């Protein structure tokens, strides 16, 4: 039953950070061990345990998959104590399982929380995404533009040349045309093997990450998580669902999707105030890696609230006993 208690993002934010931290700490011993499933399961178990300690009536809207595909943190699972506000939860207990298993950069634990009904119930299909950071006019770039047109528009807005723009793209064969178009402008490309939530977040802090724009096709659930991040950090993201067959369209209909061609903005993917937390696992330009020393594990978490625009970086030195 949905609880009518108000969504107090300030009171809930620290608890959400602890959820993210717990998942990261649980995966620490599996960094570089070559076992993706074990790393993911450890993070899932820890995240679920911590969520159930929170005084919320939570429903997982973006999770580990459909109920018949995932034993825990599946879409529709109820989490929390049941005594608290009704909330939507979007999560990825370990974004970058392969990155973790191979000890490669940019693996994160990621979770977002908003009032019940505030998040797009994105089906587990692909989404075409385009994202830029804060400070630009709305619709400066669009999914209707070619990659070349997007780069030229962004360069003009930044008052720089195309060669000064860096584009983040998932390294996939399906992106070969994007890569060719981008390089034809003289812009640089940073290819990433996994982790497109982190890829989108990089756009919001270009002075730190060196990334100006993200484009390409990735998972739709990750698109909602990325939208939650940019709702806090600023910036723009546009997403359009991609369907490869009728089964995927049926999955979308089940999730409540009616317009298959709709382009979603961040405010349509996340319609109300949201809290977002991410903790570094293997480290990268956004967050450092977990640090292990005798008796302690140290994490760094970014904790954000869209209501206030606050962005906090929290370092937690956790005794391992």
Provide a role label for each language-model segment.
Residues 79-80, 109-112, 210-214:
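Short basic, glycine-rich beta-strand/loop surfaces that mediate nucleic-acid
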Residues 108-109, 129, 320-321:
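A short local loop/turn or secondary-structure capping micro-motif enriched for an aromatic residue
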Residues 84-95, 99-120:
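DPxDG-like acidic metal-binding loop motif
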Residues 144-296, 300-305:
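An extended, acidic
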Residues 116-154:
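Glycine-rich phosphate-binding loop plus the immediately following alpha-helix
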Residues 113-115, 119-125, 192, 239-244:
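Short, acidic/small-residue loops that bind anionic groups at enzyme active sites
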Residues 1-90, 149-152, 156, 197-198, ...:
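N-terminal subdomain of lithium-sensitive/metallo-dependent phosphomonoesterases centered on the IMPase/IPPase/PAP
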Residues 10-13, 34, 98, 137-139, ...:
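A short glycine/serine-rich beta->alpha loop
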